[in-house]
Regions:
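Hydrophobic beta-strand positions
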Residues: 86, 127, 141-142
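A short, hydrophobic, proline-anchored segment that marks a local hinge/packing element in signaling
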Residues: 136-146
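Selective recognition of signaling/oligomerization transmembrane alpha-helices
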Residues: 169-183
Length: 183
């Protein structure tokens, strides 16, 4: 009798460990990735709005030069670990933090449509095949007198978001191990 109760207890303990691992690996993993993605998108959107209201707006109202705004974008590129673009409504890249200023050879985002971004302020993908890997792209309008002059677009590699999610998920695994050891 004593031996079967002990065996059942050990079996229940291992089942609890297995189900705990499965819950962390599936539900918690997805929840953490979604949370990190949403948080990063919100933070980048705040930055994009700030850029649209200051540097980019000044560029379109001729209060500053391309070079000045380019320096600001380059600094923010390093700070945010992201690629920043200023594009016009037809998809022409006016400035990019990862390309030098070259007005003679403009680059256009093929297929860009501002209507695609009407429902959500961010998207995950290759941004109209502009990148080889998936990125989190946040877009904010540059406006003046209620007219859209262009857009600030910030792209962050999904691999950076996945790395951060994995680090947070590792904490869940450590807590699960501690729970099993203490029980």
């Amino acid at each position: 009798m004593k031996k079967t109760v002990y065996t059942k207890f050990i079996l229940a303990y291992f089942l609890f460990a297995l189900f705990g691992f499965l819950v962390v690996a599936t539900f918690i993993s997805r929840a953490v990735t979604n949370l990190v993605t949403e948080t990063e998108a919100q933070n980048l959107y705040k930055e994009a709005i700030y850029i649209a209201d200051t540097y980019a707006s000044d560029l379109y109202t001729s209060e500053t030069s391309l070079e000045t705004v380019k320096k600001q974008l380059d600094s923010l590129d390093i700070y945010l670990n992201s690629t920043l673009w200023i594009i016009n409504p037809s998809g022409l890249i006016v400035l990019s933090s990862d390309m030098p200023i070259d007005v003679d050879n403009p680059v256009t985002v093929e297929g860009f449509s501002s209507a695609d971004n009407a429902e959500h302020y961010y998207r995950i993908g290759t941004f109209y095949n502009s990148f080889e890997e998936n990125v989190l792209s946040v877009i904010a309008p540059i406006t003046n007198d209620f007219q859209v002059l262009g857009y600030v677009v910030i792209h962050k590699n999904i691999s950076d978001i996945v790395d951060l999610s994995s680090k947070i998920l590792n904490i869940s695994y450590y807590l699960l191990i501690i729970l099993f050891v203490l029980s």
